[in-house]
Design a protein with these regions (language model features):
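Short, contiguous alpha-helical
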Residues: 71-111, 155-211, 267
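Compositionally biased, low-complexity flexible segments
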Residues: 1-35
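A glycine-rich beta-turn/hairpin centered on an aromatic-Pro dipeptide
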Residues: 199-240
């Protein structure tokens, strides 16, 4: 599971992205604020209309296809010290781990060494089938257990379907890692990339500042992300602030100490440090130091 550091910065000039005046008038007060909780993660479909189970199986297949003829010793620069072999062995067991948690309705941590069938077979073709089987096992487990059934997660109890969404975005980001390692193009459907950003912010809101680590933003700082893909609407805007000592965010347009504007896939790759901002099509407005500090103190 992706993990990393988490949190701050000096005042800078406000950055804002242009939007119609009527949009500003309809925003903030009624918007849902997300601070230290996972709101809406239990829905089977996201604000962008993503079918989590279908998208998860699609990304699993795409991930597998990159490995069919690849040299498994290829280094993965976005996952330091890993090769494609290690990346494959990270993603596959993770799906089966989640499936077992859901199937057994666990309310406590499952030791990964106890996962049934957690190691891929040596034959490459069989390993691909094993990878597909793990993803399907999770989808089936959620269906049998019930979407809303509470189970253990590393953020506390969540509905079983939370795990499909988590594994969907874990797989999508590691698909990007594999594509970058192999010099391939990578893109996600805008609605999927936007939901990945939302899911990541939901986790940051819960985990940021843990174990005494500084928050990614200072109290006076604000980060605004604006996805330019047509049709995303509110689902393509995120304003991140600090409220009562915690990271909070909402789907709204607003001013920020720093703002990023670009396609949802470019924004996702930038905030997860898969691509330097300069290598994406995204633009930065405002205080670059706020952005750099945010990157330094948030998880990969």
């Amino acid at each position: 599971m992706a993990a990393g550091r988490l949190a701050g910065l000096p005042p800078g000039r406000a950055a804002t992205l242009s939007a119609p005046a009527e949009r500003h008038a309809s925003v903030a007060p009624a918007r849902e604020r997300h601070a230290g909780v996972t709101l809406g993660a239990e829905r089977e479909r996201s604000l962008t209309g993503v079918d989590y189970a279908g998208a998860f199986l699609d990304e699993n297949r795409a991930f597998a296809e990159l490995f069919r003829d690849a040299d498994e010793s290829t280094p993965v620069p976005t996952c330091p010290d890993w090769t494609l072999r290690q990346l494959f062995r990270h993603v596959g067991p993770g799906d089966r781990w989640a499936a077992q948690i859901v199937r057994d309705r666990l309310d406590s941590y499952l030791d990964p060494r106890m996962v049934e069938g957690g190691k891929p077979p040596p034959d490459p073709a069989d390993a691909i089938s094993w990878l597909h089987g793990g993803a399907q096992r999770l989808v089936d487990a959620v269906e049998l257990t019930g979407v809303q059934t509470p189970v253990w997660t590393f953020l506390g109890p969540r509905p079983a379907n939370w795990w499909i969404r988590r594994r969907l975005h874990e797989t999508a980001v590691h698909l990007a890692d594999a594509a970058i390692a192999l010099g391939r193009e990578f893109t996600l459907r805008p609605e999927l990339a936007a939901d990945a950003i939302t899911e990541w912010l939901e986790r940051v809101a819960v985990q940021a500042g843990g174990q005494g680590a500084p928050l990614p933003l200072d109290n006076a700082d604000t980060l605004h992300l604006h996805a330019t893909d047509p049709g995303l609407g509110d689902a393509g805007e995120w304003t991140v602030t600090v409220e009562q000592g915690r990271i909070a965010w909402s789907h709204e347009h607003g001013k920020g100490s720093v703002a990023l504007r670009g396609g949802a896939t470019d924004l996702l790759l930038a905030i997860l440090r898969r691509r330097p901002l300069a290598d994406t099509g995204a633009e930065l407005f405002g205080d670059d130091a706020v952005w750099q500090r945010w990157l330094d103190r948030t998880p990969l």
